[in-house]
Amino acid sequence: GPFDPSHRYETSWLLSPGALFAYRATLSTYAFIATFVNLGWNGTHGGTAGQSFSYFTNLTFWGLSFYFAVAAAHTGTYWLTGRPLLARWPRWCQELHAIFYSTITVFPFIVTIVFWAILFPGYFETTFAAWYNTTAHALNSVFALVEIVLPRTQMRPWWHIAPLIFLLACYLGLAYVTRATEGFYVYSFLDVRANGSGVVAGYCFAIAIGCFIIFALVDGIIWARVKITEDVMGRKGKRS
């Protein structure tokens, strides 16, 4: 059957398509501005702009930036023409968009939890560092949570966990490639010499298990949202 016959990815139970488009476009614009300002600041203040893509935080924030841009395009085309761009794509692209949605509703929470629980140094040295870290390690999860609650998306299939774990494994490989080529550990808890292989493996398994738990919790929120907004409140989505 059709991938998304009632256009759940492009509509909201609360906002009109035009308002949802504006919201998503605004978030994408802010996220891209924050990303490029961070690159510019680090590049001109003796920072690590050249190592930006080695950090899971930054990769996840790039993902959020592009997701909201693509989601805005889908919602905008639905708003203007009645047929979203997503509906015109081949099925495999539609499935990739669904997986994309799963990544941006799981990975930001992992980033936030790991940073504040393990990596946060206790203070920020500059106002800029406070702003960007708050954006990338706190607002990222706010953006993700709103994208869970606001649209009409349904629960994701459980097989989406497989590409999520695969992407985490790919990042783990990237972290050690960075160690081999750049000479530093992106995250201190990945340092085998300092922590021991058992501790590092424990961190990796804990993050993988956390991915499962967050995925399940997010699906629970989506299930509750669908039940409350559609079955109880009778809001089947604003289509115009």
Task: Label every PLM stretch briefly.
Residues 15, 19, 182-218:
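Membrane-interface transmembrane-helix boundary segments in multi-pass integral membrane proteins
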Residues 16-31, 50-67, 71, 92-108, ...:
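Transmembrane alpha-helices of multi-pass eukaryotic membrane proteins
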Residues 72, 102-124, 172:
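Transmembrane alpha-helix/helix-exit interface in multi-pass inner-membrane proteins
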Residues 32-36, 110-117, 167-177:
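Aromatic-anchored segments of alpha-helical transmembrane domains
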Residues 35-59, 116-135, 148-162, 177-198:
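Membrane-lumen (extracellular) interface motif
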